[in-house]
């Protein structure tokens, strides 16, 4: 059925191309000019007509009479996710009033013209829908662990790379510093390299630390960041001297993935948390790690605790809850994620 004053284009011209998740590069100046012209239109139907034409252009460049896809050699461009852009245009087409249509138009213009980030990450809040790699749910379900590049999964008890990656994307910017007090196989520092974060990892076992260092060095360091592996006991190690080496006073993210008490014995070292005689001693040792590390965490930043519960002789022991209680004793606030 034809709606009065609204251009009716063939359905195939309005359908997004097969790769709807790909980016579309637009002439920024001309696209904003067109959107601004649409905002200044008096009639809602006229607004919808122009938006329908814009959608057709995004689906078929041969229809680009506006020059939106005409990129000059030195011209300013903007890259937008095609499916998200089309969804935003659909909201305008479906708007019931001119005021609502203009609201969506002005929001789109603002998202193109401005970049709005905050202190703790590089996410552009005006275009947050484009960050598909950041999980926004509190329950995380991963089909499988990331085994790409230097992530070999050789170390028994290491955590999946997606966890530190998610935390760094959420809570750090490029160039920030990340401290991992239980480095293990080097998972955190490998992700630091990939994301352009400086990383320091403390590992009690010298052999494990050496293997981790070898793997980390195999990961390309395209961002020229620091990847420091230090052999030591996180309960007592002099973190200040390590930070002084790089002329920094604090880190922006603290990651802890301690042993799940004695489920896996990682060494024979008496200072290894997996050798704690009982839960009380384990928590005391863990508390010392927290005490030693948190003074170097920048105020307002995050400590990431990754730990699971355990069963022993038919009894469920809520290690996660107990460890969070230890963290709370240090006056930190808890924000929980499940995986």
Please tell me what each predicted stretch does.
Residues 1-339:
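Class I S-adenosyl-L-methionine-dependent methyltransferase catalytic core
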């Amino acid at each position: 059925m034809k709606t009065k004053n609204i251009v009716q284009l063939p359905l195939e011209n309005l359908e997004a191309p097969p790769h709807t998740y790909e980016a579309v590069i637009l002439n920024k100046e001309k696209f904003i000019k067109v959107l601004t012209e649409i905002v200044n239109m008096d009639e809602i139907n006229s607004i919808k007509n122009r938006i329908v034409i814009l959608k057709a252009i995004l689906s078929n460049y041969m229809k680009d009479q506006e020059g939106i896809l005409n990129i000059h050699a030195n011209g300013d461009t903007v890259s937008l996710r095609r499916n998200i852009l089309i969804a935003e245009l659909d909201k305008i087409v479906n708007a019931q009033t001119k005021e609502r249509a203009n609201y969506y138009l002005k929001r789109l213009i603002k998202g193109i013209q401005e970049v709005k980030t905050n202190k703790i990450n590089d996410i552009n809040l005006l275009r947050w829908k484009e960050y598909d790699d950041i999980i926004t749910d509190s329950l995380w379900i991963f089909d499988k662990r990331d085994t790409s590049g230097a992530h070999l999964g050789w170390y028994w008890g290491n955590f999946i790379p997606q966890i530190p990656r998610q935390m760094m994307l959420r809570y750090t910017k490029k160039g920030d510093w990340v401290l991992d007090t239980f480095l293990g196989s080097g998972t955190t520092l490998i992700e630091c390299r990939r994301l352009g974060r400086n990383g320091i990892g403390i590992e009690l076992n010298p052999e494990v630390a050496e293997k981790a260092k070898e793997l980390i060095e195999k990961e390309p360091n395209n961002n020229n960041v620091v990847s420091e592996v230090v052999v030591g006991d996180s309960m007592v190690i002099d973190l200040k001297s390590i930070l002084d080496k790089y002329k920094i006073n604090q880190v922006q993210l603290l990651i802890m993935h301690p042993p799940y008490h004695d489920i896996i014995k990682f060494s024979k070292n008496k200072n290894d948390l997996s050798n704690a005689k009982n839960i009380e001693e384990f928590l005391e040792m863990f508390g010392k790690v927290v005490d030693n590390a948190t003074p170097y965490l920048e105020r307002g930043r995050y400590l990431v605790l990754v730990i699971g519960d355990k069963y022993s002789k038919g009894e469920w022991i809520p290690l996660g809850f107990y460890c969070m209680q230890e963290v709370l004793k240090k006056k930190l606030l808890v924000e929980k994620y499940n995986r």
